[in-house]
Amino acid sequence: GDILKKIYSKITKERRKQFQIETYIMKDGEQRLVVKRALAKDGVAHIRKMSDYYEKNKDEGILCPSKLISENEIAFEFLTGESLCNTMLEALEDKDEVRFLSLLRMYDGIIRSNVNIERRTFMPDAQFVQVFGEVSFPDEMECGKEMNIDMSFDNIIKDQTDSKYKIIDYEWVFSFPIPVKFVIYRAVSAFYTRNGSAMKDIMTINEIYDCFDITEEEIVIFENMNEAFNQYVY
């Protein structure tokens, strides 16, 4: 019989129709799966995109395995292990700045996997502008196509089964070029918003931005891009 059991569910109704999904955890015997389901016909393409991205990049071994289980549902393996975010917090708790910095360097490597990166003058194309608004940067910068912009430290988990770091969420991947630093900025600012107090006396947020050569001018532009992205989703 059908032994699939929903044990947790979260619905994003406040998004635009094509991005509205339910995320639920399902128990299939002993195995747990995280399922994302499109709430409307409009959302099927959004689900498909995640599956296509996984199929294209799965051989790198850095993405959490997933598969389409119906035309509007994608199921991800439920990975057990510690998130990069927690490991970073442990380093801060131990006041171990060296370890904290080495985790940031490792993160930098992870976000560069699966991506073709070029250094050039950034020229936003029409698709970019639709999502992130009109921007221009004074200097050449590294840009990548097929970037996953949701690479928060929470979304990277050290899989207990093989001790490899894996990305558990690839819902927001764009085919057009995006500055690599924008992805880093999003992760760092989200981390700081939630865990700023843990960083006290050890590192400031600006010191982290400095590690990645993110300038004050760039931060202002990235804030605007993020604002535009939220408008695009909601």
Features from the language model and the residues they span:
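A generic structural signal for beta-strand entry/edge sites
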Residues: 32, 71-75, 162-164
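Helical subdomain adjoining the active site within ATP-dependent kinase catalytic cores
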Residues: 121, 125-128, 175-234
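Non-catalytic membrane-proximal stalk/linker segments that position and tether the catalytic domains
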Residues: 1-28, 129-142, 219-234
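Conserved structural core of kinase catalytic domains
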Residues: 64-133
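Catalytic activation segment of kinase domains across protein kinase-like and atypical kinase folds
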Residues: 128-198
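ATP-binding glycine-rich loop module of kinase domains
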Residues: 9-63, 77, 84-88
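Generic beta-strand structural signal
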Residues: 27, 68-70, 158, 179
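Hydrophobic, Leu/Ile/Phe/Ala-enriched alpha-helical segments that form helix-helix packing faces
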Residues: 50-61, 103-118, 136, 209-212
